[in-house]
Amino acid sequence: MAVIRDVMPAFELVQPSSIADAQKVLEEQRENGWVLAGGMDSFDWLKDRIKKPKVVVDLSGVAELKGIRTTTDGIEIGAMTTLTEVVQHSVIREKYKLLAESAELVASPQIRNQGTLGGNVSQDARCWYYRAGWPCYRAGGNICYADTPEGRNREHAILYADRCVAVNPSDTAPALIALDAKFVMRTSKGERPVDAEDYFIGPEIDITRLHILNPGDLLTAIRIPSTWAGAKFYFEKVRDRNVWDFALLNVASAMVVTSGSIERIRIAVNGAAARPLRLKVVEDAIRGKPPNRATGEMAGKLAVEGAIPLQFNGYKIPLMRNLVKRAIGGVEEA
């Protein structure tokens, strides 16, 4: 299939200065509108001419969407705050370093300087068939090219695949789920906060999107409660190269240990399914147990129950098992 690359289609550029103005344009344009944050995902789509919006709404001039603010119950991060700003913020590094660690492993320094937190959690699937313009399920077709005997599916899903086997590529998403963050959206009905884990969706809900934003909606901020401030955190990202690459799998956990036992825990993985997965079964099973190797072993086995590998990604099952094991029992050799 021939694709014209590096030649953007014509579009109208709108540069609002307020959230209200931005949302007004997005509501008017609906499916014809496109949100431009840092541009790390957007420009790939536009240059390859796979996405052809009529109106691009550039949010770089909306000051309300930028910055990190402490609140009475935690911290609020504007959706247009860059990943570098997240990594370097003193309060995040002190109290919520799980997010700083995950953001610091995104791509390269140059991309983190430009890319935003809102963009990282809202980026689209990286499946090469979908990205190359093939008429797959996610693009409105009637086949998943990756889920065929000869399909290139080494990086794809092992859990909860439903027609499409592409995975969510965000590094910060599992960290925000583990921190019990709220994603704040502005819709036609006003402000709508949702739990981080509910912001992401799989193909069983809508095969064309990885998140719940409808045309006309806008992600404005991410709020992290103080509930998990200073907890024991663990983040690990496995990728083919130690620079630049998207994750094959990643894991994030937040844990409070009292008298040698796990009192509270939240753990999430990404790269295993179309959405980041909070492992509630694992959380329930290990609560009250010591955070040691044996508990980690049990957690890892529970995490991969029901996993079904594709032709070329069977390695993800032991990888996910060991990542979860290390997130619970520390960094002992798996």
Describe the function of each predicted region.
Residues 1-334:
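C-terminal structural segment of proteins
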